[in-house]
């Protein structure tokens, strides 16, 4: 009887594994189909419209050279040397970023950690001050973290951005719901316990055991200038809406929000910042992104919108 029960559980487990594998494969197939359709649509549109070719000349030229879809058609290739290792006491792989340890989850090998880091630095180009065509870059000359700012990193993942600015910040809130990042995040932040606060919750419009609202979280920072960075898979407009009263009432707020996840995100966020009278800019260059929806014409998307009511001399 026990053997039959065990066999039934094993068969059920195998069935569930097959189901999730097929579901994952189907999802990846749909993404690949959307990417190919987007690439072909851009080629057709560029042949039919000279205005379109001129507006997106940089991106179209690189797509033609590659002969395929790419997330970053604005960017040139870039390489970087990476110092890395494995921490035996923590059992975590790491890379060195500006002399600081940036840890990755235990399921990563050291080689995988290096690949991920190179992706952030060379592929995504998350860091920098907007000097080059890097549509995913969070800061620019006019919208950046200043000494003494309270930084709120919403969707921090490995916390590369926070680690990059932690010396300038007076305090950093790192918000990340995905539990895979908790152990490496705590290791990365260990030298900065006096200024780093990790919040393992989903950002929402209300507070609960699993959610946190930014207005509630930031009540105790009423006198500090804020730099709020968001990369939360298309939920940026929803979260910014919860912030509108705060954005109207307080001085000294700068935001950097991803706009590439969904077709309407850039336009929606632009309208929201216009409502509160913030000056704003989009990052240089465009992205192609087809993970969550089929890109609509003109297909190329702004990567990040930066907005602020701060005036720095």
Task: Provide a role label for each language-model segment.
Residues 2-168, 173-175, 178-222, 266-267, ...:
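S-adenosyl-L-methionine
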Residues 155, 229-233:
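Conserved S-adenosyl-L-methionine
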Residues 164, 168, 184-188, 239-246, ...:
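A short acidic, amphipathic alpha-helical/loop segment
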Residues 223-229:
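Short SAM/SAH-binding signature in class I
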């Amino acid at each position: 009887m026990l053997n039959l029960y065990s066999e039934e559980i094993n068969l059920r487990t195998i069935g569930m594994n097959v189901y999730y594998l097929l579901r994952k494969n189907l999802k990846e197939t749909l993404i690949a189909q959307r990417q190919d359709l987007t690439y072909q649509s851009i080629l057709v549109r560029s042949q039919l419209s000279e205005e379109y070719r001129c507006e997106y000349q940089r991106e179209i030229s690189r797509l033609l050279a590659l002969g395929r879809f790419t997330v970053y058609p604005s960017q040139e290739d870039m390489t970087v040397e990476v110092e890395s290792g494995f921490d035996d006491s923590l059992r975590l792989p790491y890379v060195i970023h500006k002399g600081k340890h940036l840890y990755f989850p235990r399921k990563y090998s050291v080689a995988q950690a290096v690949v991920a880091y190179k992706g952030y630095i060379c592929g995504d180009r998350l860091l920098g001050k907007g000097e080059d065509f890097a549509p995913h870059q969070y800061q620019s000359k006019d919208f950046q973290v200043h000494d003494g700012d309270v930084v709120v990193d919403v969707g921090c993942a490995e916390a590369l951005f926070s680690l990059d600015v932690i010396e300038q910040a007076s305090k950093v809130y790192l918000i990340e719901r995905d539990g895979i990042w908790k152990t490496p995040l705590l290791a990365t932040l260990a030298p900065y316990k006096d200024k780093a606060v990790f919040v393992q919750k989903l950002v929402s419009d209300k507070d609960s055991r699993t959610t946190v609202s930014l207005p509630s979280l930031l009540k105790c920072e009423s006198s500090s200038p804020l730099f709020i960075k968001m990369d939360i898979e298309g939920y940026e407009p929803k979260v910014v809406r919860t912030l509108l009263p705060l954005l109207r009432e307080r001085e000294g707020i700068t935001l950097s929000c991803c706009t590439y996840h969904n077709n309407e995100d850039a336009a929606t966020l632009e309208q929201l910042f216009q409502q509160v009278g913030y000056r704003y800019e989009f990052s240089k260059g465009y992205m192609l992104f087809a993970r969550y929806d089929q890109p609509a014409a003109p297909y190329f998307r702004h990567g990040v919108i930066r907005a602020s009511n701060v005036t720095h001399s």
